[in-house]
Amino acid sequence: MRLREITPDEVDELQELIESDPGYTERITGYPPGPADAQSLLMMRPEGLPEEAKVVLGAWEGDQLVAVIDLLKGYPDERTAFIGLLEVHKNYQGRGAGAAAYRLLEEYLGSEWWKLRLAVVDTNAEQAAGFWSRQGFEPTGEVTPYTYDKLESTVRLYEKPVTWSHPGLEVRRSGIAGQGLFATKAISKGEVVSRLAGRKVSTAELRELLKSPPVDTITLADDEHLVLPNDPRPVIAYGNHSCDPNLWWIDAVTLEARWDIAPGDEITSDYGTSTGTDFEMVCNCGSSLCRGKVTGEDWQRDELRERYGDHWIPALLNRIKG
């Protein structure tokens, strides 16, 4: 299956997909598909959204359009991509085509966005809510009335945070260890360099995952950890440890520049500021402040508390202030 933009010349293929599953259209409009639905899907976008921000993507197997995704980039804000719909051809439903199309969408979006957002109409929730939950989306709690001609229902918003990394980063060989992360352009002090997202697991689950490295993780709470995706592995996961890093934490998932970073500088964080108590690692970072060993108990060190102030993940900061 491959994903690409649907062109106006392919409106007939899009219309055939829409008409293959009339129940979908009926659940969200109250009417069966109309002859111009495909053309409308290609054209419609929220008022004020520029034309280039809307993309209608097709997931294809050969010449067959298997699924369609309506995507709004930078809506409702510049850090969000909004999924208007994901509809699967009737003949391909129940075969994993929707999940496969969604995975292709995440690859297409890359690391440009902080979160994905979508709306589920209650009249379609039985079919849609479970699917989106399995893809990692969670309800935001925002609920609004929904009206389409005679159909009256309710819309519930769902979101999924995604790992975002500064565009001025690249992976290459590191003098610290293996591959590292390097700046390709200047990054100013206080500028956000990455926001992490992934799957939340318990300590017991994490121990099992760590038996099959690499596993990129940070601690969220005493028994809750965030495991980053590994296929593909996000760019920020290649960031090495330093005992005098140029990044530090400003909340549970966000890293910002500790000082001005020049092109060519290696991007680092202090693993001791974001790990659980079981963690232990020999350090060869080369910094004049290298402590030789990094552990999950480093939050107790007075010199680190003074150096980083409040720039620890919340789970460790709570212990420091406890």
Features from the language model and the residues they span:
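C-terminal SET catalytic tail plus cysteine-rich post-SET Zn-binding segment of SAM-dependent SET-domain
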Residues: 241-322
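Conserved GNAT acetyl-CoA-binding A-motif
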Residues: 109-121
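Active-site acidic-Proline motif in GNAT/NAT acetyltransferases
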Residues: 89-91, 95, 123-124
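Conserved active-site alpha-helix within GNAT-family acetyltransferase domains
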Residues: 99, 123-141
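Acetyl-CoA-dependent GNAT
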Residues: 5-91, 102-104, 108
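Catalytic cores of histone-lysine modification enzymes
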Residues: 164-247
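Conserved beta-strand-loop-alpha-helix junction that forms the acyl-donor binding cleft
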Residues: 118-129, 146-151
